[in-house]
From Swiss-Prot:
UniProt xrefs under NCBIfam families: PRK02399.1-1, PRK02399.1-2
Protein's recorded name: UPF0261 protein SACE_5696
Family: Belongs to the UPF0261 family.
Gene3D superfamilies in UniProt: Uncharacterised protein family UPF0261, NC domain, Uncharacterised protein family UPF0261, NN domain
CDD domains named among the record's database cross-references: Tm-1-like
Species for this entry: Saccharopolyspora erythraea (strain ATCC 11635 / DSM 40517 / JCM 4748 / NBRC 13426 / NCIMB 8594 / NRRL 2338)
PANTHER family for the chain: UPF0261 DOMAIN PROTEIN (AFU_ORTHOLOGUE AFUA_1G10120)
Source taxon at top rank: Bacteria
Family annotation (Pfam families): UPF0261, UPF0261_C
């Protein structure tokens, strides 16, 4: 059976870590305890056994050696130990990992968790788990457990919370999950306003492929690209590239400057489109920046306000996408839905703007370096028309012919 790694600072949380390790081991899971204390090489509390792997051994995995960790400055020490822990775990067959900590321990342990493949069970019991945890979790599957009380001693509350977390890890490591490894995994990106298109395409792929749909909310795009980098995605149908709008105009659902980089790095077969490139996302209406208050705004729901992209923004969006796709070494098709890029971009709908769409399409056509494997395809339909789904599947078969899904690129 795979090994569970129980990680934390044994100089301050030895009893709690030992308690968790014992519960996981009681479920029949092999356990290795790992000390990441940064206070110095002498660690461990009187009421807890020493860790199986000491903090000096872990610190030695830092590129500059253990001295880079034990600096005497807590801030730099935590950052350096995080690097060391990531490198330490990377060299081991990790079946699952659980860590305990406050803000410092959470910042120390979660980078190593994020570096592990999606699907490896990861549990972080943290004092900061009840707030915004996006900086700790990012686009991965870390399960954050609020500690409720501080991680500072065993009591009736902490025993229950830590016990639940320990059993969650053990259950994840020992439970059976039906495998779909016989089908290559294909990623699709979707938004509410491109749902008809993506649902139709996904349903027609299911017989031969394992379609994985990602919500294009920033985190969704990053998650998809992480799986591409991990070799778990065999082809990408990136029909909803809307996260680029938020990057360009300062919306709340940007996937960052690295959007599309994994596609270029890996050469994965790629079919893309302009799904929801007509909109920038903000929160509730009152959160829309003052400079945008006179723009074409649409209240999607009480928590989401959409802003129509202008021709100038569309020009910048098109240039960004073209530059990224020019770097791709794999087969690329990028489809332009001339009838509109979303449900809101259709005749009579609030974001229908053929001029803005026209600028977007012209920039993509002029700046994308087209050749046999990298092509723009105009489609005279709205992105949600059934005929557009037909065009997507035709392009998909074309890119698969140019770049077959490899055996290693499966779920």
């Amino acid at each position: 059976m795979d090994t569970a790694y129980v990680v934390g600072t044994f100089d301050t949380k030895g009893a709690e870590l030992g308690y968790v390790a014992g519960l996981v081991a009681a479920r029949g899971v092999p356990v290795v305890t790992v000390d990441v204390s940064t206070s110095g090489p002498e660690t461990g509390t009187a009421d807890a056994r020493p860790a199986d792997v000491g903090n000096v051994e872990v610190a030695g995995h830092h590129p500059d050696g253990a001295a880079a960790v034990f600096t005497g400055d807590r801030g730099t020490a935590v950052t350096a130990m995080a690097v060391a822990l990531e490198r330490f775990l990377a060299g081991r067959a990790v079946g699952g990992v659980i860590a305990l900590g406050g803000s410092g321990g959470t910042a120390l342990c979660t980078p190593a968790m994020r570096a592990l493949p999606v699907g490896v069970p990861k549990v972080m019991v943290s004092t900061v788990a009840s707030g915004d945890v996006s900086s700790y979790v990012d686009a991965t599957d870390i399960a954050m457990f609020p500690s409720v009380t501080d991680v500072a001693g065993l009591n009736r509350i902490s025993r229950r919370v830590l016990g639940n977390a320990a059993h969650a890890l053990a259950g994840a490591m020992t439970g059976d999950i039906a495998s779909t490894e016989d089908k290559p995994a294909v990623a699709l990106t979707m938004f509410g306003v491109t749902t008809p298109c993506v649902t139709e395409v996904a349903s027609r792929l299911e017989a031969r492929y394992d379609p994985l749909v990602f919500h294009a909310t920033g985190t969704g795009g990053r998650a998809m690209e992480k799986l591409v980098d991990d070799g778990l995605i065999g082809a990408v149908l990136d029909l909803t590239t809307t996260e680029v709008c938020d990057l360009v105009a300062g919306g709340v659902m940007s996937a960052g400057e690295g959007r599309l980089d994994a596609i270029a790095r890996t050469g994965v077969p790629y079919v893309g489109s302009c799904g929801a490139l007509d909109m920038v996302n903000f929160g509730a209406f009152e959160t829309v920046p003052e400079r945008y208050r006179d723009r074409n705004l649409y209240v999607h729901n009480p928590q989401v306000t959409l802003m129509r992209t202008t021709p100038d923004e569309c020009r910048e969006i098109g240039s960004f996408i073209a530059a990224k796709l020019n770097a791709c070494r794999g087969p690329v098709r990028f489809l332009l839905p001339e009838g509109g890029v979303s449900l809101l971009d259709a005749p009579g709908q609030p974001f229908h703007d053929p001029d803005a769409d026209g600028v977007l399409f012209e920039v993509l056509e002029s700046e994308l370096r087209q050749d046999g494997d990298r092509r723009i395809v105009r489609v005279p339909h709205n992105i949600n028309d059934p005929a557009f789904a037909d065009a997507v599947l035709t392009a998909f078969e074309e890119v698969l012919g140019a770049g077959t899904i490899q055996e290693g690129q499966r779920e």
